[in-house]
Structure formats: structure tokens, C-alpha cells
């Protein structure tokens, strides 16, 4: 009996464990699926998916692979090249009257071959021993190009992430804006119903009721407009993620606390200093300067001599020679080995032009880096200013919303009692809507600009 009780106890524990696992699975799944079966995406999920599927990013990765192939080709150019060739020809001499004579059993036999063939065979090689370090510098240049292509891919990835953050934040704003307008519509309907009651008892004119009805209709239009904007930005996000299916698409709307919105903004200088060290566009611009230095060296190689080695082995056969093929192949072998030296004397100023243009490109690359650093500082400065300004606006708007709501609640009660007219009621309602929208706008602009500052500082969007 004791054993049976122990078994039952263990089974109950096992069932409880299974139930807990199933419940946890349902809770995890609920993050991705709404009550209607629509998957909800977090911003990080959008970014991760785009990094794997965005076509523009994939094309950028191919550029890096192409640069890698160029580098392999440049390295292979240091090695000697070899080639083999053969030429076979068939000839015919219709009026030939002499041939090869042989003696068999005391008799002389003469064989006249009017058809014959020739064969030639060769193996040759060439090696550039020195060409003013052009090959070595080409390898350096292609290495820099490969690194630059990799950084270009990172730039593309950053651009996509920034765009996702921008669209995602706009979706969050518009989603809340829809809710605000829906709340306004509920209020408008109540006012319209109250107006109808007042009309029935003779306390309101039809003209005043028409204004309330017009306000309700306008609020319905505002909802449609807000929903349309929301759908448009969701579509833009789907396109950025390369989602082409007809599945419903939605995003997770996080709950941003006031502490999150009003958190300390990192200093402008600290963000800029970190961005100079980590942003791929800065590193790529620095590589462009190094590349221009190497390009100058490559151009100057046009003034230097080049040395090359050549060698070859040739042989030939002829069916009329009277000896067998193997003997001919051996006896007709000819080998060659040569050293070539090319010294440039005058090239019509071609090399000087290339050197000067490479130096101009060198200066251009240096100016491009300075311009990029200036643009980077300006962008970060704008993000910082927007974050700080909208934080202050959010504080002011939050206070204004509370005051406007209290004022409108009072106006609504006074209107219900007949102490306020329609104009005052509608003005109060419009003021409340305006302050709520200002609060939402400053809230999400603060969040977006904070995200961008963190992204430029750490390379991650959170």
C-alpha cells in the first residue's frame, strides 16, 4: 500500500510539472500572437530578421565576397604562370615520287608517303620577379578594399537598424494616437447623446445638436486617418523586413515608464568620442586614406624598371623523318631560359599624371574624413538636442494633459447641467486632444532620440 501511495504522489508531481511547462509555453507564445492569431514583433525581432533577410544587406555582403576574390587574384599574381600547347597538322604531296626504301629478302621496296603529319609541343613559364612592388602594393590595396567592403556591409546594417527604429517608434506613436482618438470618439458620442436628450426637453437647439454630431463625425474621421497612417507604417516595416506574405503584422507595444523616458541623457562629447571609435563609416573613411597612400605607391612604380624570367621547352615530330615518334620527341627537344628587363624612359607623362591624380585622391580622402567627422558630430548633436528638448516638452505636456483633462471634466459636467455652451465644451475637448497628442509626440521623440544616442555610443539599439 505504501508503494502505491508513493507512485501516486510521484505521478501527481509529474503532472504538475507538465502543466507548469505547458503554461509557460503558452505565456511565451502569447508574446508573439494576439488574440486574433496575429504575430507581434518586438523591435529586436524586427532587427534580427532584417539582418538575415533584407535584400539590400545581402547584396552588400556579395560585394565583400567579390573583394575577397580580388584579393585572392592579387596574391596569385605573385606566382609564376605556366602554359602548355600543342599543334598538329596533316599534309599531302600529290606529285611526290621519292620515299623510304627498305630491303626485304634481297629485294628493295620503296614506299612513297604522300600524306604526312607534323606535331609540335611546348611548355612555357613566366614569372615577374620585380615590378616596382606593384604586385605587393596591389595586394595591400585589395586587402584594404576587402576591409572596406566589410565595413560597407556594417554601414548598410546600421542604416537598416536606424530605419527600423524610426518606423517602429512611429508605429508605437500612431498606435497610441489611435487609442486617444477612440477615447475622444467615445466622449463625442456621449456628448451627442446628451445633446439629443437636451433637445428632447427643449434645452438645446437643432443647430447646437448638429455641431455635436459634426464633432462626432470628425472624430470618426480622425480615427480612420490615424489608422490609415498606422497601417502605412506597418507596411513600410514589412517591406523593410522583406515580408511578402499576407499574414497580419503587428508590433509589441512596450510600457515606457516615466523613469525610462526621463532617464539621464549621455553627454554629447562622450557619444561623439565613442562613435569615432566604433562607427564603421569612420573606419571606412580612414581606410580610404590608407588606400590612397598605397595608390600613390602603385602609380610611382611606373617610373621603376621591371624584371621577369621566362623559360620554355619545345619539341616536334614529323612522319617523314624516318625515325619513330619517341626518338623524335627526345632528339628535337629545345629549351630556353631568359631574363627580361624593362626600363621606362618616356611614357608621354602617363605615369606622372597617374601619380598626381593619386595624390589628389589622397587629399580628397583626407577631406572626406574631416567632412564625415563633422557630419557625425552634427547628427549626434541633433539627436542630443532633440532628446533633451522633447524630455522637457514631455514634462510640460504631462502637466498640461492633467490640467486639460480636469478642465474638460468640469466643462462636461457644467454642460450637462446647462451651465456651459457647446462652443466652450468643444474648445475644451480640442484642447485636451491637442495636449494628449503633444504628450505622445514628445514621449516617442524622446525615446527615439535616446535610442539613437545609445546606438551611436554602443552600436546597439535597445
Give the location of each predicted region:
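Small/polar, glycine/serine/threonine/aspartate-rich low-complexity segments that form flexible
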Residues: 32-39, 85-127, 254-264, 297, ...
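Sec-dependent N-terminal signal peptides
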Residues: 14-23
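Short segments within alpha-helical structural elements
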Residues: 76, 218-243, 401-459
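Periplasmic alpha-helical coiled-coil/stalk elements that build and connect Gram-negative outer-membrane
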Residues: 41, 69, 159-274, 386, ...
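Sec/SRP-type N-terminal targeting helices
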Residues: 58-62, 75-76, 115, 129-157, ...
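Bacterial Sec-pathway N-terminal export signals of envelope proteins
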Residues: 22, 30-87, 93-94, 245, ...
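Positively charged n-region of N-terminal signal peptides that target proteins for export
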Residues: 2-14
Amino acid at each position: 500500500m505504501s508503494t502505491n501511495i508513493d507512485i501516486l504522489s510521484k505521478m501527481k508531481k509529474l503532472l504538475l510539472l507538465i502543466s507548469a511547462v505547458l503554461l509557460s509555453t503558452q505565456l511565451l507564445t502569447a508574446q508573439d500572437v494576439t488574440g486574433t492569431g496575429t504575430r507581434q514583433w518586438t523591435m529586436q525581432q524586427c532587427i534580427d530578421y532584417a539582418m538575415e533577410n533584407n535584400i539590400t544587406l545581402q547584396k552588400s555582403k556579395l560585394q565583400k565576397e567579390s573583394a575577397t576574390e580580388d584579393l585572392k587574384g592579387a596574391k596569385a599574381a605573385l606566382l609564376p604562370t605556366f602554359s602548355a600547347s600543342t599543334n598538329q597538322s596533316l599534309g599531302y604531296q600529290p606529285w611526290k615520287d621519292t620515299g623510304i626504301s627498305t630491303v626485304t629478302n634481297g629485294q628493295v621496296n620503296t614506299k612513297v608517303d604522300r600524306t604526312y603529319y607534323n606535331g609540335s609541343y611546348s611548355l612555357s613559364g613566366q614569372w615577374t620577379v620585380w615590378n616596382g612592388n606593384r604586385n605587393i602594393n596591389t595586394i595591400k590595396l585589395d586587402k584594404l578594399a576587402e576591409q572596406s567592403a566589410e565595413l560597407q556591409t556594417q554601414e548598410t546594417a546600421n542604416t537598416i537598424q536606424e530605419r527600423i527604429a524610426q518606423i517602429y517608434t512611429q508605429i508605437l506613436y500612431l498606435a497610441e494616437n489611435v487609442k486617444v482618438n477612440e477615447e475622444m470618439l467615445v466622449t463625442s458620442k456621449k456628448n451627442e447623446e446628451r445633446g439629443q436628450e437636451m433637445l428632447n426637453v427643449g434645452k438645446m437647439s437643432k443647430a447646437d445638436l448638429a455641431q455635436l454630431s459634426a464633432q462626432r463625425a470628425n472624430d470618426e474621421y480622425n480615427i480612420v486617418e490615424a489608422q490609415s497612417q498606422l497601417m502605412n507604417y506597418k507596411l513600410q516595416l514589412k517591406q523593410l523586413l522583406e515580408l511578402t506574405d499576407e499574414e497580419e503584422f503587428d508590433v509589441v507595444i512596450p510600457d515606457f515608464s516615466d523613469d525610462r523616458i526621463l532617464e539621464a541623457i549621455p553627454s554629447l562629447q562622450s557619444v561623439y568620442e565613442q562613435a569615432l571609435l566604433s562607427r564603421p563609416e569612420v573606419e571606412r573613411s580612414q581606410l580610404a586614406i590608407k588606400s590612397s597612400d598605397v595608390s600613390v605607391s602603385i602609380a610611382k612604380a611606373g617610373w621603376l624598371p621591371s624584371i621577369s624570367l621566362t623559360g620554355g621547352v619545345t619539341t616536334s615530330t614529323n612522319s617523314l623523318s624516318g625515325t619513330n615518334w619517341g626518338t623524335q620527341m627526345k632528339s628535337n627537344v629545345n629549351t630556353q631560359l631568359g631574363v627580361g628587363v624593362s626600363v621606362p624612359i618616356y611614357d608621354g607623362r602617363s605615369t606622372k599624371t597617374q601619380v598626381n591624380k593619386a595624390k589628389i585622391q589622397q587629399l580628397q580622402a583626407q577631406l572626406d574624413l574631416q567632412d564625415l567627422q563633422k557630419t557625425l558630430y552634427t547628427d549626434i548633436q541633433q539627436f542630443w538636442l532633440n532628446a533633451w528638448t522633447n524630455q522637457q516638452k514631455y514634462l510640460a505636456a504631462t502637466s498640461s494633459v492633467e490640467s486639460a483633462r480636469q478642465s474638460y471634466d468640469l466643462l462636461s459636467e457644467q454642460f450637462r447641467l446647462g451651465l456651459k455652451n457647446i462652443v466652450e465644451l468643444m474648445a475644451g475637448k480640442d484642447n485636451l486632444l491637442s495636449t494628449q497628442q503633444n504628450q505622445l509626440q514628445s514621449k516617442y521623440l524622446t525615446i527615439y532620440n535616446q535610442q539613437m544616442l545609445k546606438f551611436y555610443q554602443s552600436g546597439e539599439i535597445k
